[in-house]
């Protein structure tokens, strides 16, 4: 067996010039690691800390579209992301890994999903993975409060327009979820000579309603009918009796620790033994490496139709795929293997951003982050040509106000919006138009500012998940409170607005303090945190009136 580097280089050389169009599931993977500062005792509740290792594009189609360029195949992902910072990061990541993003968009009606993969120890102390899409209503995804995926639509001739816009015929079309639009695009591309690769983990088995389950299964079979290669796992698709109805396909079923098997046309199933990696660290992405390496291998073998395939060559291609997938589990993260390759150069991730006519800045509450539920709500209702900056505030108050003043000097925002702790800082940024929502003017009394260690409740850009308030920092908060109104000017009195929740039991009393220094006070019916409908009804009109 060739060394892994030789295998990869061989694939790159032979697959050079081949193309793959792909659509389906994309997510921003948040790779985290849990550590145990006091050690780990099996069966006990152990104190732990969590930190973010990195954040990057993932999920099945996202991985395949970024793994294939590493193996020599040019990719063209089709994706509709939103205009959140995470949505733009996905577009940049795709470009950075070598994908052509001409069919990727960032719009208000797009969707962005975040997915946490946490490396932990299970009850016995063995390494394990925990997956999560959202937590206690906290936002882990784009402009929505739950996973938000937007696929190519069948409406208004969108599929035909996309097909007509292609100035090349892709060698492979990859999709990973049952959608009518994906099936329709496959139907348009196959007659042109494109090989269609369909990977699925859902045939409707989990749907409780029998009518819905049958409808999902029929939709799955329609996708199979319009595909050439169909890949699935034995865990998700244990019953493979349907394959006997198709005689012009290649079916691939992964078997976990038992390897992989395939059925080509009318041939019987052939099982290939697994390739184990004794240096296992993370299985995340192994299945996607299997798909990517197999696609690259058949591209290199010029085996881009089922009619050209033989069981011998399919076996060879799958063994190459298994070898690369086995190697990949020796690294943390689905694309850890690429990160570790010092000789592989990532691409420039610069993308064309919108031309903004207004620039706003949002400052968050304590123990939070700039990109939080409230900023999501604001961004959701802002005009598309208005930019929203979402910096993460620092735990040290003096360092934080200094950082914010420097940022304002650099960015020159048209408006600053601060909530709770953010309102405390915002009203001190003299010389700018500001809205302070339930400002915490006695911030040193906040439970999140007490002396000791605290956890950030939302992921931050720097990946740090905890902070410590020292006695000196607590004194600095008190000192800042005492002088917070010293810089108020006549301009500030007219251009710093207070917006207070009538049901705010946390800092509602600060309205009287605020009104002693500023001239404009408004209220909304809610509590300390604004709901989306309150943002739309009360905050957005105020923003537009001020700007």
Role assignments for model-derived ranges:
Residues 2-17, 241-354:
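Conserved phosphate-binding/catalytic region of the ribokinase-like
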Residues 354-410, 528:
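Active-site catalytic motif of lipid deacylating hydrolases and related acyltransferases
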Residues 42-52, 70-172, 193, 344-351:
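Conserved N-terminal subdomain of the carbohydrate kinase-like
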Residues 433-547:
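The alpha/beta-hydrolase serine catalytic core
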Residues 2-78, 82-96, 279-280:
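Glycine-rich phosphate/adenosyl-contacting loop at the front of the ribokinase-like
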Residues 171-246, 250, 259:
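Conserved beta-alpha-beta core of the PfkB/ribokinase-like small-molecule kinase fold
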Residues 51-58, 78-79, 384-400, 523:
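A short beta-strand-loop structural module common to alpha/beta enzyme folds
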Residues 417-427:
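Gly/Ala-rich beta-loop-alpha elbow adjacent to hydrolase catalytic centers
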């Amino acid at each position: 067996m060739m060394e892994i580097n030789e295998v990869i280089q061989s694939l790159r050389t032979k697959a050079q010039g081949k193309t793959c169009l792909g659509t389906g599931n994309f997510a921003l993977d948040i790779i985290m690691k849990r550590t145990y500062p006091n050690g780990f005792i099996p069966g006990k509740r152990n104190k732990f800390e969590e930190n973010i290792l990195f954040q990057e594009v993932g999920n099945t189609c996202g991985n395949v579209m970024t793994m294939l360029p590493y193996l020599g195949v040019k990719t063209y992902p089709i994706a509709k992301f939103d205009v959140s910072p995470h949505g733009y990061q996905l577009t940049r990541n795709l470009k950075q890994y070598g994908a052509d993003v001409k069919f990727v968009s960032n719009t208000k009606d797009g969707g962005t999903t975040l997915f946490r993969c946490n490396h932990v120890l299970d009850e016995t102390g063995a390494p394990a993975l925990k997956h999560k899409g959202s937590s206690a209503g906290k936002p882990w995804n784009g402009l929505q409060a739950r996973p938000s995926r937007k696929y190519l639509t069948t409406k208004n001739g969108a599929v035909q327009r996309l097909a007509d816009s292609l100035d090349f015929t892709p060698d492979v079309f990859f999709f990973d979820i049952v959608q009518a639009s994906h099936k329709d695009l496959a139907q348009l591309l196959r007659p042109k000579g494109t090989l269609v690769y369909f990977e699925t983990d859902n045939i409707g088995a989990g749907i409780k309603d029998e009518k819905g389950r049958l409808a999902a299964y029929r939709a799955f079979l329609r996708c199979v009918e319009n595909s050439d290669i169909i890949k699935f796992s034995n865990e998700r698709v244990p019953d493979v009796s349907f394959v006997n109805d198709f005689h012009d396909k290649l079916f691939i079923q992964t078997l976990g620790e038992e390897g992989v098997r395939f059925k080509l046309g009318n041939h019987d199933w052939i099982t290939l033994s697994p390739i184990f990696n004794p240096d296992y660290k993370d299985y995340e992405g192994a299945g996607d490496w299997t798909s990517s390496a197999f696609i690259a291998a058949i591209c290199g073998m010029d085996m881009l139709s089922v009619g050209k395939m033989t069981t011998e060559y399919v076996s060879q291609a799958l063994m190459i795929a298994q070898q690369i997938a086995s190697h990949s589990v020796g690294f943390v993260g689905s694309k850890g293997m690429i990160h570790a390759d010092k000789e592989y150069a990532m691409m420039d991730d610069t993308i064309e951003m919108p031309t903004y006519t207004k620039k706003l800045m949002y400052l968050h509450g304590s123990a939070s982050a700039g990109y939080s539920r409230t900023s999501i709500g604001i961004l959701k209702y802002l005009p598309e040509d208005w930019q929203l900056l979402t910096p993460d505030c620092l735990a040290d108050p003096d360092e934080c106000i200094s950082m914010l003043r420097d940022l304002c000097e650099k960015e020159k925002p048209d408006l600053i919006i601060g909530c709770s702790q953010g309102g405390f800082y915002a009203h001190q940024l003299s010389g700018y138009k500001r809205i302070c929502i339930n400002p915490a003017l006695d911030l040193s009394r906040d439970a999140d500012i007490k002396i000791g260690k605290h956890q950030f409740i939302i992921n931050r850009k720097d990946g740090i998940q905890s902070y410590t308030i020292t006695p000196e920092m607590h004194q600095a908060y008190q000192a800042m409170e005492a002088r917070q109104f010293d810089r108020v000017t006549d301009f500030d009195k007219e251009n710093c607005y207070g917006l207070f929740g009538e049901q705010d039991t946390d800092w509602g009393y600060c309205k009287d303090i605020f009104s002693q220094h500023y001239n404009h006070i408004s209220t909304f019916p809610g509590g300390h945190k604004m709901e989306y409908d309150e943002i739309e009804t009360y905050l957005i009109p105020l923003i537009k009136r001020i700007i």
